[in-house]
Amino acid sequence: MAGQGDCCVKVAVRIRPQLSKEKIEGCHICTSVTPGEPQVLLGKDKAFTYDFVFDLDTWQEQIYSTCVSKLIEGCFEGYNATVLAYGQTGAGKTYTMGTGFDTVTSEEEQGIIPRAIAHLFRGIDERKRRAQEKGVTGPEFKVSAQFLELYNEEILDLFDSTRDPDARHRRSNIKIHEDANGGIYTTGVTSRLINSQEELIQCLKQGALSRTTASTQMNVQSSRSHAIFTIHLCQMRVCAQPDLVNETVTGLPDGAAPTGTEYETLTAKFHFVDLAGSERLKRTGATGERAKEGISINCGLLALGNVISALGDQSKKVVHVPYRDSKLTRLLQDSLGGNSQTIMIACVSPSDRDFMETLNTLKYANRARNIKNKVVVNQDKTSQQISALRAEIARLQMELMEYKAGKRVIGEDGTEGYSDLFRENAMLQKENGALRLRVKAMQEAIDAINNRVTQLMSQEANLLLAKAGDGNEAIGALIQNYIREIEELRTKLLESEAMNESLRRSLSRASARNPYSLGASPAGPAFGGSPATSMEDASEVIRKAKQDLERLKKKEVRQRRKSPEKEAFKKRAKLQAENSEETDENEAEEEEEERDESGCEEEEGREDEDEDSGSEESLVDSDSDPEEKEVNFQADLADLTCEIEIKQKLIDELENSQRRLQTLKHQYEEKLILLQNKIRDTQLERDRVLQNLSTMECYTEEKANKIKADYEKRLREMNRDLQKLQAAQKEHARLLKNQSRYERELKKLQAEVAEMKKAKVALMKQMREEQQRRRLVETKRNREIAQLKKEQRRQEFQIRALESQKRQQEIVLRRKTQEVSALRRLAKPMSERVAGRVGLKPPNMDSGAEVSASTTSSEAESGARSVSSIVRQWNRKIDHFLGDRPTATVNGGRPARKKFQKKGASQSFSKAARLKWQSLERRIIDIVMQRMTIVNLEADMERLIKKREELFLLQEALRRKREHLQAESPEEEKGLQELAEEIEVLAANIDYINDSITDCQATIVQLEETKEELDSTDTSVVISSCSLAEARLLLDNFLKASIDKGLQVAQKEAQIRLLEGRLRQTDMTGSSQNHLLLDALREKAEAHPELQALIYNVQHENGYASTDEEVSEFSEGSFSQSFTMKGSTSHDDFKFKGEPKLSAQMKAVSAECLGPPLDSSTKNITKSLASLVEIKEDGVGFSIRDPYYRDKVSRTVSLPTRGSTFPRQSRGATDTSPLTRRKSYDRGQPIRSTDMGFTPPSSPPTRPRNDRNVFSRLTSNQSQGSALDKSDDSDSSLSEVLRGIITPIGGAKGARTAPLQCISMAEGHTKPILCLDATDELLFTGSKDRSCKMWNLVTGQEIAALKGHPNNVVSIKYCSHSGLVFSVSSSYIKVWDIRDSAKCIRTLTSSGQVISGDACIATSTRAITSAQGEHQINQMALSPSGSMLYVASGNAVRIWELNRFQPIGKLTGHIGPVMCLTVTQTSNQHDLVVTGSKDHYVKMFQLGDCVTGTIGPTHNFEPPHYDGIECLAIQGDILFSGSRDNGIKKWDLDQQELIQQIPNAHKDWVCALAFVPGRPMLLSACRAGFIKVWNVDNFTPIGEIKGHDSPINAICTNSKHIFTASSDCRVKLWNYVPGLTPCLPRRVLAIKGRAPPCPDLPPPPLTLPILPFPVFPPPRSELLLHVT
């Protein structure tokens, strides 16, 4: 076929501009284009190279002219073409292709298809017009179009007007077929014949509007189908005749058509493919029909990607190309790997939120570059045959011409070859070029020598002048210029003389050869012979010269036969070189030969004969001497060659002279005729004058004089004209002379310019080569660096994989060890009592317990036989597989030891198969881990992008607020400045998020490169190298692995269902308990208004309207208790815990109902509830003041909160392993019928230290930071029935060595206490239970509870000047007025807003996150005067003026969140603020009289701590700082320097610092619960005491006591014991109860009746308990 060839699919990348929405949301551009190179960079350093790359500012016209214009021109030559637009949804594919006609577009915004249509019809008109101008038959064109839509894998015809647009899901009748040549065509498709551009545009618009589009979250008008617009072009034109045929065969001029006109038919089709965008359902938000469309689109694109991967496989491993997997790939089979010129335009988005889609699109397009198409011209068979024959004729004609010209010859053996003349000509041309180079080099050497001579002569002249004493630089320069000019003139003079001599000799030769040329003078025929005679003579001379030349050629042939050919070539070259040096002798010989030719021809003939005979004689004489013979031959041959050349030159000159003679002849004849006419006119004038003179009758003297004067005047005028003409002639001669000189100079300058250009070209070429070499070296180095980086990443990845594998193995080993130990315990013999207890089975166990027990037993049994059975099964399979017969089993089914024969082949087989399976397993693990990593990184990037969008919206709102404030009150500088600061903070956060997004993108790119490396090691190599037996073994392993994974999934699902069932059951139990409690309290509340008010508050807070309402919430206590009940498998535990906890709670309530009436004089609800303190049952009493029982009772009356979550303690308690249950089961606790002792629960365990790097904590979100991590996922009830009380504690004997003595303990909070503040009369505490309590230190009672906080209360302060209490929770500061029933009067926010009243009153559940634009407040401090409030929020401290409740400034300078601060006053009554942050630094801020705006730190204390700062304390000029690095530092505020530091002051975080009242002693408390006393002066320890079993969160003092708040929900009051020496720490035992018993005795037990059947809650009327 004509024009066959391979061409690769070209790929262009277009980066669309950012949308306004993306700019508003703060999306950054993650792509960049290398200037001048078709390369696009994604992220930081991931580069992709394509054929074309178009950046953001590229116009439609540029894309079309660069990519598609050549394809349209190719269609006119019969080549198919395809343009594909690929990319994600909203990347600009439809806009680029130009199929979106839903809006009016300008001409500049027209896409590829409208421009291609215009180009097509413009080309048709141009070709018709060109043919008309040449006068040949114009081509005929036929254009047709089709428009197909692939919707949900169904082909729809968009030109079919009869199709129902709503019936898209019906099957269409369009079929795809393949012709004999592999071309794809469709049947059942409407094909419209097109006659004009407007008609085709209208068809395109009609089809585009019929295309399926819909709206998604990513694009308002999203294409929901693939569209293929096809243009078919059929062209019939006159066959183009080759130039060789026109000139040599037909004899017609080029371009003229021959008489027999032949036509050829060309066809072409052009596909314009607008693919639908690749989608992610979670980004498009598609559901229902849109989701199905997206799935279909992605399936088609996946099939297209598989085809591209198969075609672009460089290793050529893929034999089958899956074209039939999708109708899309079937339709595009021509375009991908077939007969088509294809270009793919990949449209991508530059925004970083589309990073993954952009990366996938670029990788997709990069694979398409490797596809090679086989492009041929689509001709009919007749035209193809004619073209082939015409090409054959042209080739034969060219070969014939070469034979005629002597270029080709036929050897004796019949082989073709080139003639000697052709080879000689080529050799001479090469030699001529070498001589030219030599002449050029010599000329340069001459110029250099001339410059050197000039320089030397000038130096000589300068020396002479210097000796004469007249030396001067100007004179020397002038002399040098003169000498240079003299040398140049001398050189030109020599050249002119040589040229003059050459011309003179040429003229003498011409005059000697052509004596008749003198007769052709302008004098006319009178001075020579006739012109005809001279012409005949010249012709005769030429004829004779040609004869002479033929004779010499024959002589040379004879000589050549006698001399070897090789030596002749060498001698001729040598003689020609010598000939150039002996010019004078040759010229003399030429003159003699010319004279001989022009003088006497007969004598010349005789001389020639004599020369021939002489040469023959010399040849005969030289036969005796071979060397002389050879030399003579070569000399004669060279002479003949030179003579032939001279004769040839003479003949050429004669012919030229002949032509010049003819020209002169014509000129002289014309001039002669002109002169003859002039003579004739003069004679006529003379005759006329004579006639007039004769006829004159009266001739007077006067008239004669007049005539004479006229003639003289005319003569003078003619003489004057003659002089002018002569002057003009001289001027003309001078100009001609100057012109020749100018021409010589011009030629010389042109030659110099040409040489300079050549030198420039050589230098440019050298520079380009050097640059290319440097680029190659740099590319190689970069490739090596990238390879090393990849190797490093691969090794790191392998290390991580090995570490993970090791951890997994350790976990599996630990689990197996536990199973083995459990099985061993099961195998131990049991006592009869235990065995009997095991035999007992509870009659009605709940479903959860049954499932748990069955699961446990099945796990135990399966664990006992899992290892051995798997090993036996595996051995049997291997034995059966290898052909070994198993031996008999002995000892109850245990296989006996087999005697295997030694078979090296089987051993090697098993080892090779095992190695292959291990390699495949490692590969699978690597792929899974890598994909998990990529998915996690994508999730992180999406989360960061969403966070950035939120911050941008907030920033935009603040900007609008600032603009509004500027417009309304421009003088409000304070508010504007605060808004500007907040905007700056948001901008900093956005920059940090952008950096994090960039890091995620870089990591994803690195992982993708590693993924490509893993993909390169294809598992098909391992699988293809397997034998049949190995393949079976691998298949068996895969089957086992899949079964194991399925089993794990089923177990996880069963666990989830079990937990869901427990959750529902707990929900129902809690609901019923709450209803019963409310009903019981309502009955009791009829006589007690206080209880009625409490019940009303509880219902209002928790949303209970009536007892009939179904409640889905559940309490913390019921959740943990029900889990405990279900988790126990012991019979004892079941008998105790099988009775629902509701019964105990109902017993408590009923006992209260049946007890003695309350004292009527007691009106306080606290006193009324205090009657519930003593509850007796079965003759045994217990005190609710005991924290354990009090906690149980408090849970009884606590009601759930909506939206509550499971507490950590309950989650930890419920997750009891079967092993733990088995331990309790095996121990077999005895049943006690009379009493059952309880031990108080241990304190909550201390929090484990965060193992993260401290610097990573600094960069964490500031809103998540809080002092001592005071955040809890759990929630508690807002309603507390019991009020707190301060219980005095008697000092234990032998406690005299402790520096502190605990005197009282305050209890009342249900969660850890995080903060406290105290005066001499009042104590304020804040807890994780979202409440604050106010205590009366005089009476030891709780005064009020300040509730309604959104989260943990992390800081509380009391202002004695104003009587206000400030409490901090989340991002809010509540201001309480305790003088007026303790109500919240204002709410301050971290952003500086002031809200009247309680802004959190509607918050019934725990708020885990802060509001938008707010930050977590970690601590606050009051100024000593009480007029300023300093609030640490984020990495700044906001200053509030309490007189107006307005923010007036900010303290900035920290990088991390500010965790603590303290305030003191300087000598000039100015506030001095010291802050500590997570960035390890302590900063000091000294404030002046006017505090406004942003204030920077006065001093940064160096060196910093090794971790975050937790607490600060100031006494005088001494500052103490405690840190998470377990150390305390002592600073001097005056000198602003470090005095002393103790690195390990505690074994855990230093959480609180304070001073002993009235003494120079420092108190420090840590997270381990220890309190240390230090001497302030020398910073030495005085004593240590174990203050709490849980972390101590805060410490404060008043004038008498020391208060410590701990996570054990208690506040202890301490007194300092004076006069003690440093001692070892001792444990402080908290004695519970008003009448404290012995500390070592357990609390009074609670006895419950043992029932042989499960206890269910009785009806309400039967809720009776007897108190004994």
Swiss-Prot record:
Region (Disordered): 553-629, 837-866, 1199-1253
Name by which UniProt lists this protein: Kinesin-like protein KIF21B
Repeat region (WD), residues: 1308-1345, 1348-1386, 1412-1450, 1453-1495, 1504-1541, 1545-1584, 1587-1624
Organism (species): Mus musculus
Cellular compartments annotated: Cytoplasm, Cytoskeleton; Cell projection, Dendrite; Cell projection, Growth cone; Cell projection, Axon
Function recorded in the entry: Plus-end directed microtubule-dependent motor protein which displays processive activity. Is involved in regulation of microtubule dynamics, synapse function and neuronal morphology, including dendritic tree branching and spine formation. Plays a role in lerning and memory. Involved in delivery of gamma-aminobutyric acid (GABA(A)) receptor to cell surface.
Compositionally biased intervals (Polar residues): 1199-1219
Coiled coil (residue ranges): 372-465, 924-1019
Subunit structure as annotated in this protein's UniProt entry: Interacts with TRIM3; the interaction positively affects motility of KIF21B. Interacts with GABARAP and GABA(A) receptor subunits: GABRG2, GABRA1 and GABRA2. May interact with GABA(A) receptor subunits: GABRB2 and GABRB3.
Residues where ATP binds: G87, Q88, T89, G90, A91, G92, K93, T94
Listed GO MF terms: ATP binding; microtubule binding; microtubule motor activity
Modification sites for Phosphothreonine: T583, T1239
Primary location: cytoplasm
Gene Ontology BP term (one): brain development
Null allele phenotype: Mutant mice exhibit behavioral changes involving learning and memory deficits.
